[in-house]
UniProtKB/Swiss-Prot annotation:
SMART domains: cwf21 (SM01115)
Family: Belongs to the CWC21 family.
Comp. bias intervals (Basic and acidic residues): 99-109, 530-549
Spans through the membrane: none
Biased composition (Polar residues): 1-31
Function: May play a role in regulating breast cancer cell invasiveness. May be involved in RYBP-mediated breast cancer progression.
Gene Ontology CC: one annotated term: nucleus
Biased amino acid composition, Low complexity: 257-278, 291-313, 417-433, 466-476, 488-507
InterPro entries given in the database record: mRNA_splic_Cwf21_dom (IPR013170), SRRM3_cwf21 (IPR047489), SRRM_C (IPR029360), SRRM_Domain-Containing (IPR052109)
Residue ranges occupied by any CWF21 domain in the UniProt entry: 55-98
Organism expressing this protein natively: Homo sapiens (Human)
UniProt region (Disordered), positions on chain: 1-47, 99-597
Annotated protein name in UniProt: Serine/arginine repetitive matrix protein 3
């Protein structure tokens, strides 16, 4: 066959138009038929040759397998190495003979082998190897030829028994292999399951996070998740709150998001607030969704109607007194701030009045401070306040109501409410003044306010808010906490951006923090109020620098967040309406551009 193939190839190559035995397209049409015919003639040889090589290889493999089985069997039976070698050699030779003729004829392709010049014992010169020489034994075999000669009779006699015994061994081996493979497969499947399950878990968690960011249901899931981890977090947070590192990890996560405080707070409060937990985008979304959820869940609650009341609860108790008292009272924020805060305070106060039950939950005294301020505002801007309340409620529902309500509750648990009022007022003033323009002095009052009024929040936030914006977050929380926060942030004009940004983070923080106050009240918030009030002031001072930095960060973050909140993609109706209402209430559309910017 090889000669025919070679001849065919040579003849093909000899044709001027063929290269490597294949006709070239450029060749003249006359040469094509010849080349094709030659190729066809050569094909069977090529195919047979390939088959032969493959079959030879398989034959060799089969023989070696059987020889190995025989060797193992003999070793098990206790034969000496020499005996084993001799028997294996003879067995191999016999197998080669059988493979060459007898076995091959019974198998597909055996006819090809029979057709080939190879004889039972002869090796075709063209093949890779000669199966064996009669006297020298198999060419590949290392055993001496005498081995094979002496044991040929033995081979033929014991062929059936030896061959029969090896196959069972094959079966055994196969079984063992199957068992092993099964075990391996199981292990691999388990490993893969384990790995896949982690992946799935990760994917699920990612999906859950996405859902949480977008769904209130997911928020609940977060809450549940965070609750389990909350216990740990609460303990950690209790310890960390005192060090002001409530949850550095959370901080890092939320801080990276820019609302690390709100995330930490939100994480403290619950993962539902963990919108803040979520990456900044997710936090914003989570805040938005959280606010929506909170608005959904909180707005259902009376404070939901006065979602702003709930924000006012947060801001109202600490931030309102701070934002309302601070803004209107401190007038640190531009007159717009006091005026807009006062309207907002009024709205919030009005909302607080409707939501005093909810606010009452939080801290009637801070409430009363913002309420008293807001009450005058209420009288002045009752209708406008109501409208704003509605808008704010929407907003608070969407973003602040849940945290704000919780925040209110937090002020409630926080005995530092009085201080939170003064602090929040100072914060609002300092936040509005320093948070926006005088972070240095402002942060202290703001941080104090946050620590005092938000004592819990501030304490929670200082660790969080400090990185993001502790005082601003308190102040921002106050501003955020109440629509005032937004209105203030918007009304302040230039500061509105920072405030709106810090507020939006603060809002998310205050929301999450305030929300957390509820859940933190579960563990951290009550402790936080005390530790925050105590540590809050120290932290407020300590975090004043941090808070100023965090405020700047949070402002930068919060503007982005606010944009996200305001972005029609997340909460178009509520955010836009709430943002528009806040803007219109506080400064009008003008402040919106700064937050958006």
């Amino acid at each position: 066959m090889s000669s025919t193939v070679n001849n065919g190839a040579a003849s093909m190559q000899s044709t001027p138009d063929a290269a490597n035995g294949f006709p070239q397209p450029s060749s003249s049409s006359g040469t094509w038929p010849r080349a094709e015919e030659e190729l066809r003639a050569a094909e069977p040889g090529l195919v047979k040759r390939a088959h032969r090589e493959i079959l030879d290889h398989e034959r060799k493999r089969r023989v070696e397998l059987k020889c190995m089985e025989l060797q193992e069997m003999m070793e098990e039976q206790g034969y000496s190495e020499e005996e084993i070698r001799q028997k294996v050699g003879t067995f191999r030779q016999m197998l080669m003979e059988k493979e060459g003729v007898l076995t091959r004829e019974d198998r597909p392709g055996g006819h090809i082998v029979a057709e080939t010049p190879r004889l039972t014992e002869g090796a075709e010169p063209g093949l890779e190897y000669a199966p064996f020489d009669d006297d020298d034994g198999p060419v590949d075999c290392d055993c001496p030829a005498s081995c094979y000669r002496g044991h040929r009779g033995y081979r033929t006699k014991h062929w059936s028994s030896s061959s029969a015994s090896p196959p069972p061994k094959k079966k055994k081996k196969k079984k063992g292999g199957h068992r092993r493979s099964r075990k391996k497969r199981r292990l691999e499947s388990e490993c893969s399951c384990g790995s896949s399950s982690p992946l799935r878990k990760k994917k699920k968690s990612v999906k859950k996070h996405r859902r949480d960011r977008s769904d209130s249901g997911s928020r609940r899931k977060r809450r549940h998740r965070s609750r389990s981890s909350k216990c740990k977090r609460k303990e950690k947070n209790k310890e960390k709150k005192r060090p002001h590192t409530e949850s550095p990890g959370r901080r890092s996560h939320r801080h990276s998001s820019g609302s690390s405080h709100s995330p930490s707070l939100s994480s403290h409060y619950s993962d539902s607030r963990s919108p803040s937990r979520l990456s900044p985008k997710h936090r914003d979304e989570g805040r938005k969704t959280g606010s929506q959820r909170s608005s959904g869940s909180r707005s259902p609650s009376p404070s939901g109607g006065s979602g702003w009341g709930s924000p006012q609860r947060n801001g109202g108790s600490g931030q309102r007194s701070g934002a309302h008292g601070g803004r209107p009272g401190s007038a640190h924020s531009p007159p717009d701030k006091p005026s807009s805060p006062s309207p907002r305070v009024r709205d919030k106060a009005a909302a607080a009045a409707p939501t005093p039950p909810a606010r009452g939950k939080e801290s009637p005294s801070p409430r009363s401070a913002p309420s008293s301020q807001g009450r005058g505002g209420r009288a002045a801007g009752g209708a406008g306040r109501r409208r704003r309340r509605r808008r704010r409620r929407r907003r608070s529902r969407s973003s602040a109501s849940a945290p704000r309500r919780r925040g209110r509750r937090r002020p409630r648990p926080a005995p530092p409410r009085g201080s939170s009022r003064s602090l929040s007022r100072a914060r609002s003033s300092s936040d509005s003044g320093s948070g926006r323009g005088a972070p240095g002095p402002g942060p202290e009052p703001g941080s104090e306010r946050g620590h005092g009024g938000h004592g819990k929040r501030a304490k929670e936030r200082p660790p969080r808010a400090r990185p993001a914006s502790t005082s601003p977050s308190p102040g921002a929380h106050g501003r955020r906490g109440g629509p005032e926060g937004k209105s203030s942030s918007r009304s302040p004009g230039p500061h509105p951006r920072s405030w709106s940004s810090s507020r939006s983070p603060s809002k998310s923080r205050s929301r999450s923090a305030e929300k957390r106050p509820h859940s933190p009240s579960r563990s951290p918030s009550p402790k936080k109020p005390l530790s925050r009030d105590k540590d809050g002031e120290g932290r407020a001072r300590h975090s004043e620098a941090e808070a100023t930095r965090a405020r700047r960060r949070s402002r930068s973050y919060s503007p982005i967040r606010k944009r996200r909140r305001d972005s029609p993609s997340f909460m178009e109706p509520r955010r836009i309406t709430s943002a528009a209402s806040v803007l219109f209430h506080t400064t009008g559309p003008a402040p919106l551009p700064p937050p958006a910017a």
